[in-house]
Amino acid sequence: MNVSAIVVEYNPMHNGHLYHIKKTKKLTNCDALVCIMSGNFVQRGFPSILDKWTKANIAISNGVDLVIELPTLYSLSSAEFFSFGAVSILDSLNIINSICFGSEIGNINALQDIATTLLEEPLEYKILLKNYLDKGISFAKARNLALVELNRDNKIMSENISKILSLSNNILGIEYLKSLLLLNSSIKPFTITREGADYKDENLHEEYSSASSIRKYLKENKNINILKDFLPLEGFLEFKRLITKGYNFSMEDSMINYIRYKYISGYKNLHNLIDVSEGLDNRIYKSLEKNFTYDSLVGEIKSKRYAYSRIGRILCQYFIGFENYDLNSLLKSTPNYMRVLASNEMGLKVLKKIKKHSSINIYTKLPKNTNTLLSLDIKATNAYSLLNNNIRFNEDYFRSPTIIKNTIY
């Protein structure tokens, strides 16, 4: 059985994601497609607009065979740890033949060259990186500048690196490749050219609109029918059904009052979070005292050194309670379990193969004794239940994976 994998967030799933699924199947000629997906919180530091079970069901209805949850620790981490968490789980299954991700460049060799340099970190690169960091530049920007200068004698390569590293999907793809190299994985990487609007684009476009634009529309409008052209049919019908039921779509603004209440209640322990350094905690506390919306809060805190997404993740981690965990130790280890969210009949065959070839713990129901990583997932869902009244406290203990039969793909 030829099994391919994709790493996704689906916040929410749109036509660009469906394109990714179809192109992956065509490019890899796979018999089955496994998807590892962020759960109730996503990498930019937002709550997912739909709960993880609903997202998983929509994915199965659109051509995925098995959906595995990416632990919250990784889904709310930097691109480096987000990618490592996903790839390490896929690698430990011992049955994944390939992974396919979208990138703006669509050239696997160019991304592979950069990934190799970043992983090996030659001495000149380290020196250049330190020099830029000492100037107060953010790590991501400093890394880009160091790579460009490292290749200054090759003008074409230098210009290409600068362009490649300015685009988010290229950066994430490089991190997937770094993780594969670090793990000495046999999984073969593929990339496809990303189609559609940039993820930051908040305007709806024909055929391929960004998840940001769809969330913005749902936040500001009640006429769901407008989105029919931008969502896969099964996803659109599910949105209509959820609206009829009075489903509570979760947006980032829904966290703000809980975050402010936690702060004024005396929980001033942001310094325990990995991404918080150099007095950033005090900067956040001061902003919490005078900002009442998510955008105004993050907008005031972010700076040349602290990117919007980093601040968003810090706030989301604080909301959930990450500061009470030993995050350094957790991130240095690799996950020893996979949590199944949904499957079809082909996915069940994939699960049987995983059981045969891997020692990883497979959870379709939560065990009585949970490890720290899994307990953080449970805590995240409980925090999410404050934002989405369709999700119960301890929902993780009540839900089993959905098995969907007779999907059309």
From Swiss-Prot:
Recorded hits in Gene3D superfamilies, A to Z, give: HUPs
Primary location class: cytoplasm
Write the Enzyme Commission number(s) for this entry.
6.3.4.-
Enumerate the catalysed reactions: cytidine(34) in elongator tRNA(Met) + acetate + ATP = N(4)-acetylcytidine(34) in elongator tRNA(Met) + AMP + diphosphate
Q: Name one GO molecular function term.
A: ligase activity, forming carbon-nitrogen bonds
Give the top-level enzyme category. ligase
Binding residue positions for ATP: 7-20, 102, 169, 194
GO process annotations (BP): tRNA modification
> What UniProt keywords are attached to this protein's entry?
ATP-binding, Cytoplasm, Ligase, Nucleotide-binding, RNA-binding, tRNA processing, tRNA-binding
Q: Which SUPFAM superfamilies match?
A: Nucleotidylyl transferase
Q: Which GO cellular component terms, listed alphabetically, does the Swiss-Prot or TrEMBL entry include?
A: cytoplasm
Function (record text): Catalyzes the formation of N(4)-acetylcytidine (ac(4)C) at the wobble position of elongator tRNA(Met), using acetate and ATP as substrates. First activates an acetate ion to form acetyladenylate (Ac-AMP) and then transfers the acetyl group to tRNA to form ac(4)C34.
Matches recorded under PANTHER family: TRNA(MET) CYTIDINE ACETATE LIGASE
Similarity remark? Belongs to the TmcAL family.
Q: What is this protein called?
A: tRNA(Met) cytidine acetate ligase
